[in-house]
Amino acid sequence: MESQQLSQHSPISHGSACASVTSKEVHTNQDPLDVSASKIQEYDKASTKANSQQTTTPASSAVPENPHHASPQTAQSHSPQNGPYQQQCMMTQNQANPSGWSFYGRPSMIPYTPYQMSPMYFPPGPHSQFPQYPSSVGTPLSTPSPESGNTFTDSSSADSDMTSTKKYVRPPPMLTSPNDFLNWVKTYIKFLQNSNLGDIIPTATRKAVRQMTDDELTFLCHTFQLFAPSQFLPTWVKDILSADYTDIMKILSKSINKMQSDTQEVNDITTLATLHYNGSTPADAFEAEVTNILDRLNNNGIPINNKVACQFIMRGLSGEYKFLRYARHRYIHMTVADLFSDIHSMYEEQQESKRNKSTYRRNPSDEKKDSRTYTNTTKPKSITRNSQKPNNSQSRTARAHNVSTSNNSSGPDNDLIRGSTTEPIQLKNKHDLHLRPGTY
């Protein structure tokens, strides 16, 4: 009877019914280890199916292996911040995808991120609120973004409520190269600002307005890993993540500083390529400007050798300094210091020439004064002519008439002509007579 019951059990009851049969009730001469390979596979399948129907805690083998951790946490681990977890150690598909990432059409990239083993990755409760995205967001990432520009807006007045997000928030594109990481960070920060998380992002001029919550940190870790695969991250980003794989804010802060540095580098290279000098400014100021640019570029990892630097400088010389383009073109080992030495020498010669010209130049006022002054060789005094023109009313006729009358008759009405004929003649008429031509 017992043997019939044993034969009625299917292989599915391998983990339950077979366990109730003792060794005394089984009468067989078959070696228990002598089992065919097909039987073993059937037993394994049956055991797996039976375990999947149970409501106990899932085995750790059902969770995908995390490449970033050698020994994953167990179900009994507790978070020092959020208290004990629920029975499930790993997040289910719904918990790992609370924001509806399937709308982006990339469900294969959603499951279990490298950050899920961190205690900070688990939400504090089963009903954590994340920004929900409508199904219309599932457009190809190559389409133009509705947000124009990559500039960072002031997010100090951004709403921190995670439940009320903007509509049509476009996700950042996928990072495909380490060289494009800084450009990708611009779009990622824009994505966080549109998701009402702009007040937790530091800028180049100020720190973050507030500290992020655990849910917000979970959201940052998940989206950062989702859109920036680890194989495309720069080395300095991997170094930060190796020390603390949840320190996304440090990565964003350092990226913003690098963006500011890159902007200065572009400005310095542009200034160096558009140099212009003609001697209108001191040579010391021109040398200091060029030297500061070269030092900044060298400190930022963009060294410029002497040959290239001299080419930039000589290209900007004009006027008399243009001669230095051809005077130094045969020197192979010419340095920037040698070129500036020639510029200083030419500038000093130019300034000395200007000073000499100003010394020998005659003053126009002095020339005008000399034209009106005559020196008498016989007499020590000089005679200066009257600068005013004679009155038109006393013409030549009147003066001639006065001379003729004074020669014919002498009287008290007329003054005698004093001095020699070579001296200036001055006539005085106390009656102030004005004669017209033809009246005498």
Curated annotation (Swiss-Prot):
Site (Cleavage) residue list: H401, N402
Composition-biased stretches (Basic and acidic residues): 363-372
GO biological process: viral translational frameshifting
Residue span of region RNA-binding: 299-401
UniProt entry keywords in alphabetical sequence: Cytoplasm, RNA-binding, Transposable element
Protein name: Transposon Ty1-NL1 Gag polyprotein
Chief site of localization: cytoplasm
Cellular component terms (Gene Ontology): cytoplasm
Compositional bias annotation for Polar residues: 1-23, 48-60, 71-86, 131-152, 373-412
Region of interest: Disordered: 1-86, 131-171, 350-425
Note: Retrotransposons are mobile genetic entities that are able to replicate via an RNA intermediate and a reverse transcription step. In contrast to retroviruses, retrotransposons are non-infectious, lack an envelope and remain intracellular. Ty1 retrotransposons belong to the copia elements (pseudoviridae).
Inducing or repressing factors: Ty1-NL1 is a weakly expressed element. Induced under amino acid starvation conditions by GCN4.
